[in-house]
Amino acid sequence: MVGASAISGVVIIANVVAAIAAAAGDGDGGIASTTDTILTLDGIKILNNALLQWKDDCNQRALAEVMPQCIHGVENITPSQQKHTAMELSICEFENNGLDYPLECHASVRNLNTNTCIQALEKSPQYWTTFSGNYRAVKDICHQISLPYEKDQIIEVYENMTLLYRSVMEDLKSSHHKYTVELEMKIQNKFNKLFSVVDDLMRSRAEENNKVNQTFNKFYENFQVSISNALVVMQNSYDGANTNFELMQRHVSYFATELQRILLLVQEQGEKLQVQQEQLVTGNVKLSIQQERLFDNMQLFGNELDKLHNAEVSRVSSVNKQLKLTEFSIRHANSILRENTDELHLQRMLIAEYTPIILGNITTLLMHFLNQSASEIVENFEHSLNLSLEKLSLKIDETANSLAVVNATIARCSIFASSVVETLDSLKNSTIRMMMLFMSMITPSVTFDGLISGAKAIIAFFTLVTRLAAVIAICLLIILIWPIVKSLFFQPLCYLMRRCSYIVVSILVGVAAANFSVWLLQK
């Protein structure tokens, strides 16, 4: 119905333009009659009524807010516009099906606050299912109805063009009428002036008969000039009018050609729109099938959502029970904690009160323990010292025996040394005698002094040999005696000093540990 009204309006526009083109060459009368024809046409009213009837649909009003975005691109739709359009489409669906909907969604309330209506729809699963389905389908619907809106835009453009052509023709008519009236006034004024001049000449002819010929000649000349000027002016005016008519005829012809081309384009667009309407019908059938499937899926989803809601309700109730139990446990723990805090405070006071007493007792016990330990250590030290002294006395006895043996050995060695010395002295004396005898036998001329000096040299030699022998004997004696002295004196003395050092170090460590323990207890 809407497409037929729109096409009929376009056909009326084309007929009007054709009438304008046909009357373009008829002059003033043709233009006036064409303008009267335009003024009496009711095609524009029919077109406007068709457009208003098409725009009064509820769904079209609901989609009016997103019409520019639908025409220029679906991606230009904002979330708020999508939400508002989905709400309006849901209300249109409720009204078309005769269903009741919340009071918050009535026009007087939802125009003030859209969110109130959406919150009211959310309370009912059926309303919310319709709203959510329309919210998701707004962009698809916008894409599907974009072509009819383009058709509506084209029709509005053609309507504006018709009004523009009407205003142009009215302007042409008014300008032509004004120009014709001005031209007639100019010619009338010129003829009035001419007639006044002729009257003056006729009156002066009776008065001045002598000057008639001269005046007539002058008048004739002036009249010829005036007539020629008037003819020139009239010719120029006629030429200007013809030029304006030709220019206007060319404009009208151009407008007629353009409107004819636009009519062809409109017919082509009408055919395309018819094909698209058929495709849209097919798409609507598919969409209805998909909507039925979607409705079934939404019902299943609603059932699952109800189950999930019931499960969540039970879970929330169990969580509330757990929270209450936890709250009771926390309160009980807080009471126990307060009791423990009081007990700890009391115990701290008792500790602060009895700490000096306990420290005193510990110090006394520690000192007693240290004294007892020191006495035990001293007794052990005395016992060890006695044992060491006994061992040392035994070692000394053994050493004395060894020294006796050594003394005997030394005595024997000294006797042996004395015998060796005596033997060496006797050997020396014998050797001297033998040397003196030998020298006297070899050299009878040697004096007594020479013999004495030789004997002294020999004695000095044997004395040196004797001393060397004594030194060697003493060294051998020391080498023999040193192991015995070492085993008898140095080893017991080192053992005794080592045991004494162990005992002294133990006593010092115990005293230091006791002092440190007392210091810690005092802190």
From Swiss-Prot:
Cytoplasmic side: 491-500
Principal subcellular localisation of the protein: endoplasmic reticulum
Glycosylation sites: N160, N213, N361, N371, N386, N407, N429
A GO CC annotation given for this chain: nuclear membrane
Keyword Glycoprotein: yes
A biological-process GO annotation: karyogamy involved in conjugation with cellular fusion
Signal peptide range in chain numbering: 1-22
Keyword Protein transport part of the UniProt annotation: no
Membrane topology: Multi-pass membrane protein
Top-level taxon of origin: Eukaryota
Segments on the Lumenal side according to the record's topology features: 23-469, 522-523
Cellular compartments annotated: Endoplasmic reticulum membrane; Nucleus membrane
Transmembrane segments: 470-490, 501-521
A Pfam family assignment: Tht1
Task performed by this protein: Required for nuclear membrane fusion during karyogamy.
Family assignment from sequence similarity: Belongs to the KAR5 family.
Name used for this protein in its record: Nuclear fusion protein KAR5
Protein source organism: Lodderomyces elongisporus (strain ATCC 11503 / CBS 2605 / JCM 1781 / NBRC 1676 / NRRL YB-4239) (Yeast)
Lineage: Eukaryota, Fungi, Dikarya, Ascomycota, Saccharomycotina
